[in-house]
Amino acid sequence: MDRLDASIKSYPHAEGIEAIMTQTDMTPLQRLAKVLQLGTPSNYRNHTYINGESLYFPTGRVYGGQVIAQSLMAASRTVAPSRLPNSIHGYFISAGDIRQDLLFDVENLRDGRSFSARRVNVTQAQGSILTAIASFQEHDQEGIEFADPMPENIPDPDSLTSAKQLMEPYAEQSPFAKYYAEKSPFDIAM
């Protein structure tokens, strides 16, 4: 356990939430790409440990979609490049703090001829925040696919009002509005 505790450290990239929020040297999309790159992996037995940081979110908590994406990225670093994500299942244990680094503990469950399976446990100083299991499959092997047909008579996404457009008038009145108007790497059409 000492090895895990030594790897968990306070958020080294900023002095508090305000500094994270006011990072202006990168666009929101560039910040997202940087967060998804994660740190340098270190190996111990059949585990790989990788540090990651968080994007700003107005609550001060780690956004769940971010940590799921980072878990998939961490797991993908431990499989052959020819294996692509097949599935991921995640279970949120507790809220994460954006001021602390995330530690991704990737356990190699199995490497078969066609599939690889990984378990990812994401921790911070207070303990586990997410546990996920990811499966990867050789890219040239096709399996059974299921998909519903695309619905008809739905509006074109570009014709819809974006979250950014809706939130801009309220950006100075609400941290959430400011986030969606200026800081979010995603723009949601409604």
Describe these PLM feature segments.
Residues L4, I8-M190:
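Terminal targeting signals and extreme-terminal segments of soluble enzymes
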